[in-house]
Amino acid sequence: MNRFENQTAVITGGATGIGFAIAEKLAEEGAKIWILDRDKASSEMAAQSLRYKGYKADSIGADVSDETEVKAAFDKISKDGDCSIVVNSAGIVGPNGINTTEVDLADFEKTCRINLTGSFLIAKYALKVMLPNKYGRILLIASIAGKEGNAGMVAYSASKAGVIGIVKSVGKEYAESGVTINAVAPATIMTSMVEKMEPQQIKYMTDKIPMKRCGKLEEIANLAAWIVSKEASFNTGFTFDMTGGRAVY
């Protein structure tokens, strides 16, 4: 299946984890991939690994929270061809396991700047390149924390709730444009970072999930691929659940 033949996809935070899994899935189905990551060396390594498999991939270094860098990145990518898919997977956890009264304002603002402002800027400049073509797919990676809130993670929860708000607003604003914007709100996904956690910590997280397991990278990549495909033509402004039944709304 080559659903994305002759399409260019930009994946932020695409050097590792969820972002890379989505990048690889889209590449497998014919997309030319741009890995956009703050760490240029890591983004190039990810692009190289895709090229090694015979896929079309390039890399670019940019901080999603810096408007000048985001604009420059999209300007460069646009010169290479029309960009019809953008997935924003860049983000940080921020203060974790800390009561709100002990959270430093600078840490709160940094988390929101990367997760929330970054999502806004990526959506803004993705729209600028997609609207003239009257077609595009934007996907923002949110979190179950944005729907339910996680104790001890006020900055992350607030920033991801904001991402869901962006999707709702922008989806309605551009509903007739041919450009859709949606989000995925995952619970715990089995990434290399999660694999390194203590078993009891993983059990604590999976106990909240009715399926009693972590999500798999290929599962979120498969869902993401459908959301950014032409098949998903009547969905916009929506946040898709990826929580094994934890959130059913």
Question: Which positions does each model-derived feature cover?
Answer:
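Canonical Rossmann dinucleotide-binding motif of NAD(H)/NADP(H)-dependent dehydrogenases/reductases
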Residues: 2-34
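Catalytic Tyr-X3-Lys loop
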Residues: 84, 101-120, 135, 139, ...
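Substrate-binding pocket helix/loop in short-chain dehydrogenase/reductase
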Residues: 96-100, 104-109, 194, 201, ...
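Short C-terminal tail/terminal secondary-structure segment
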Residues: 97, 148, 225, 236-249
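Active-site helix of classical SDR
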Residues: 123, 159, 167
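Alpha-helical segment proximal to the catalytic Tyr-Lys
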Residues: 128, 172-176
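Residue(s) in the substrate-gating loop at a strand-loop-helix junction
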Residues: 143
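Short, small/polar-rich loop/turn modules that mediate ligand/substrate recognition or access, typified
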Residues: 175, 180, 235-237
